């Protein structure tokens, strides 16, 4: 195997990270010469990055092929018509890059490929005898990210492995989904990632069920609620919990209005002279679900989860109502709102409030609130419905056992969906079943962010000196360097490099005319798993220095044995 000579390689390392780099992976990928920024959320992948990303892709291909996946390569440029067939042309909004050709035709750059693969299936699949099918590709995707940041974690151009399963029925989809789940677990394990699979929100993808694969890291932008006792885990967009029952008093026979001039926040109502604890307040929020008003009610000390509201309403998109939209509907401005006997719009109430009494809420009159509110009597009895709306908090009870939930930041590295017939029905992708009846194909969709795997590995595996790569995705398995300029050291190092190559070990040969300290520092920064140093003293005794990047002590290894030792280490870790 051919070694790469450092003196001839393009490895533009930096002593300092860019000022705007906030997370470890961004800092280290730039400092180690893996990436450079071309524009906001747009990166150049330099040779070291390409080597690591190619290894990630190879692992993905092996595991996809192992479950019967067949690789495609479909266009990144899509005509608008195909997205309009599924109804998602308008749903994607500003996240989609859109353009017109010279004839005025509408196109987009693909964020994902459900529509495109469904079109292939519609045109080519005719019978249940052709199913199941598992198709995938590793291809560039585009997203007009409003706030690109964190290096490769939030970008506008990225590489995704997207796979799609096609089955004749739900049972087949269940099998395909589990095949993908197991394949994902193997992929992430081989890439050296500690991960957790969690229940997730399907969002604009649709479908009946989805799971995300998450890496626990402070660099993550998602929140996961997990129970260490029973291993329940869910994105807080879908997570539920047990809330301790409140000891409410009997309340009043009917709500009573009282003046609250200038009180427009939960916190203000907690203060004297009113002194109403947040847990006894009803927080009433006005949202627009597909531009239709909906009222959401949660406890005063709880937060509304917009993803849960979207699920509860079945809306394509939800947003907070603009301040000027609220008074015509509610009769008051934000801060004095309530849902007591309110029937002018759909009202959703979090289940934790169902049996609460003696609560306080806005009176839908500026400067006034209501006390003595019985949620079941005064809200639910007038057409409001219960729906999971609140964001769970750390310390709340697990919904599956007697344990307590932990909530932590996490980074999504993969997402799998049971799409069902969402796309096949809208795009008329059908096959004949065993009884000769036309039925819509039952689909699944499965995505992995290739660059996110690289970034996540670095977030998990780094120290003060640089990256600590897992062997399977390191740009090189080993680096060989000399501890002096003497010709005999160079000759011995060349022989070690050749022996390593014969064993299939990928080597970066640091042949630069630099001090040993500089070479050691760069080796640590690049994160190469094995460091082999050839020095005068050791060579005189027939040895070389061996050190593992992952916290290993320096060992002396006979020159004739080092290649075998390295090969064994590579095989054991990949």
Swiss-Prot record:
Record lineage: Bacteria, Pseudomonadati, Myxococcota, Myxococcia, Myxococcales
Keyword Transcription regulation annotated: no
SUPFAM superfamilies assigned: Class II aaRS ABD-related, Class II aaRS and biotin synthetases, YbaK/ProRS associated domain
Gene Ontology CC terms: cytosol
Source organism superkingdom: Bacteria
Alphabetized PROSITE patterns for the sequence: AA_TRNA_LIGASE_II
Protein name, per record: Proline--tRNA ligase
Location of the protein in the cell: Cytoplasm
Gene for this chain: proS
Enzyme type, top EC level: ligase
Quaternary organization: Homodimer.
Physiological role: Catalyzes the attachment of proline to tRNA(Pro) in a two-step reaction: proline is first activated by ATP to form Pro-AMP and then transferred to the acceptor end of tRNA(Pro). As ProRS can inadvertently accommodate and process non-cognate amino acids such as alanine and cysteine, to avoid such errors it has two additional distinct editing activities against alanine. One activity is designated as 'pretransfer' editing and involves the tRNA(Pro)-independent hydrolysis of activated Ala-AMP.
């Amino acid at each position: 195997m051919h070694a790469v000579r450092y003196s001839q390689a393009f490895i533009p390392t930096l002593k300092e990270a860019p000022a705007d780099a906030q997370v470890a992976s961004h800092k280290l990928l730039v400092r180690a010469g893996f990436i450079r920024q071309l524009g906001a959320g747009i990166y150049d992948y330099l040779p070291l990055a390409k080597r690591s990303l190619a290894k990630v892709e190879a692992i993905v291909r092996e595991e996809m092929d192992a479950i019967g996946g067949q690789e495609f390569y479909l266009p990144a440029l899509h005509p608008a018509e195909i997205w309009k067939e599924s109804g998602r042309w308008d749903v994607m909004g500003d996240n989609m890059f859109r353009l017109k050709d010279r004839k005025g035709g509408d196109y987009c750059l693909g964020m994902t490929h459900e529509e495109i693969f469904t079109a292939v299936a519609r045109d080519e699949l005719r019978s249940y005898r052709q199913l199941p099918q598992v198709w995938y590709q590793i291809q560039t995707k585009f997203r007009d990210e409003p706030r690109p940041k964190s290096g490769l974690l939030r970008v506008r151009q990225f590489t995704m492995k997207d796979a799609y399963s096609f089955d004749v029925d739900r049972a087949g989809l269940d099998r395909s989904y589990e095949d993908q789940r197991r394949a994902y677990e193997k992929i992430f394990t081989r890439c050296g990632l500690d991960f957790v699979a969690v229940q997730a929100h399907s969002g604009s993808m649709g479908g009946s069920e989805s799971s995300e694969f998450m890496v626990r890291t402070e660099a993550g932008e998602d929140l996961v609620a997990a129970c260490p006792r029973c291993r329940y885990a869910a994105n807080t967009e879908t997570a539920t919990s047990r809330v301790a029952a409140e000891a409410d008093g009997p309340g009043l026979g009917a709500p009573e209005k009282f003046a609250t001039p200038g009180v427009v926040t939960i916190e203000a109502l907690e203060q004297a002279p009113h002194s109403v604890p947040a847990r006894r307040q009803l927080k009433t929020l006005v949202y627009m679900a597909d531009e239709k008003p909906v009222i959401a009610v949660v406890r005063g000390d709880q937060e509304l989860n917009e993803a849960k509201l979207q699920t509860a309403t079945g809306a394509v998109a939800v947003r907070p109502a603009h301040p000027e939209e609220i008074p015509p509907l509610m009769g008051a401005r934000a801060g004095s709102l309530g849902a007591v006997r309110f029937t002018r719009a759909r009202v959703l109430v979090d289940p934790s409030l169902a049996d609460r009494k003696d609560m306080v809420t806005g009176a839908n009159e500026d400067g006034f609130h209501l006390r003595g509110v019985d949620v079941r009597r005064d809200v639910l009895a007038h057409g409001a419905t219960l729906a999971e709306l609140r964001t769970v908090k750390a310390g709340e009870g697990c919904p599956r056992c007697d344990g307590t939930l932990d909530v932590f930041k996490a980074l999504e590295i993969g997402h799998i969906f049971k799409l069902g017939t969402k796309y096949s029905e809208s795009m008329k992708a059908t096959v004949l079943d065993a009884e000769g009846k036309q039925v819509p194909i039952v689909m699944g969709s499965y995505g992995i962010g290739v660059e996110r795997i690289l970034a996540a590995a670095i977030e998990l595996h780094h120290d003060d000196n640089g990256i600590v790569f897992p062997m399977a995705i390191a740009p090189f398995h080993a680096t060989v360097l000399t501890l002096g300029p003497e010709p005999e050291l160079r000759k011995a190092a060349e022989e070690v490099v050749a022996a390593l190559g014969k064993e299939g070990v990928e080597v970066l040969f640091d042949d630069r005319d630099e001090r040993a300290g500089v070479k050691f520092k760069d080796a640590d920064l690049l994160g190469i798993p094995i460091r082999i140093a050839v020095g005068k003293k050791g060579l005189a005794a027939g040895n070389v220095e061996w050190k593992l990047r992952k916290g290993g002590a320096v060992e002396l290894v006979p020159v004739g044995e080092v290649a075998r030792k390295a090969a064994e280490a590579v095989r054991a870790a990949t």
